[in-house]
């Protein structure tokens, strides 16, 4: 794997912007989907694991005016990017950053909400740049360890939301079940009507619940589907 930094382009949303940076991860549809889909009503304290540029924290801060959000990342470039994006947002007073490994960091309280776009390449060629490798590969944050840590940090009635590709998501859910998690919500995402499901959005909790299942298709022909627009229109400029 070649070392180095990866410059990512900036991205402007309706109420905040993501500046160009060396964070290693550009704004992705996965992240926007998760930030728009995750439900944190009745939550007070949210933990954003692997915040990167701070996208998920900013989306949740926009959606939930009562949330106090702690964002963590192991990468220094990500911390710099998130700090810049937070400081220029309308919600900077509710956004806190911590630099370090979430498996080792000490927190003063538990969280009733967790959001995470986890790494998901378990094998194969590593990403070219160091930051992208950290963001994309499970070498630095294995899924079983992530789930165990989330159990420690989540309140008994809290909720943890994730997005993963189909295969990795199914494996993640199997691990979660083995650890005693319960699947509260599940959304199967397809890029277009004739394409197979390629992403899973899901909410896990430690309390028992009946699973609510739904489907989402991103594109309908040459345009975004009505369901995708409804989900994301508070964020994308051209919706």
From Swiss-Prot:
Q: Does the entry feature the keyword Transferase, yes or no?
A: yes
Q: Which GO terms describe its cellular component?
A: cytoplasm
Molecular functions per Gene Ontology: nucleic acid binding; tRNA (adenine-N6)-methyltransferase activity
- On whether Repeat is a keyword of this UniProt record, the answer is no
Q: What is its EC number?
A: 2.1.1.223
Q: Which Pfam families match?
A: MTS (PF05175)
Recorded catalytic reaction(s): these are:
adenosine(37) in tRNA1(Val) + S-adenosyl-L-methionine = N(6)-methyladenosine(37) in tRNA1(Val) + S-adenosyl-L-homocysteine + H(+)
Q: Which HAMAP family match?
A: tRNA_methyltr_YfiC
Provide the protein name: tRNA1(Val) (adenine(37)-N6)-methyltransferase
> What is the originating organism of this protein?
Vibrio vulnificus (strain CMCP6)
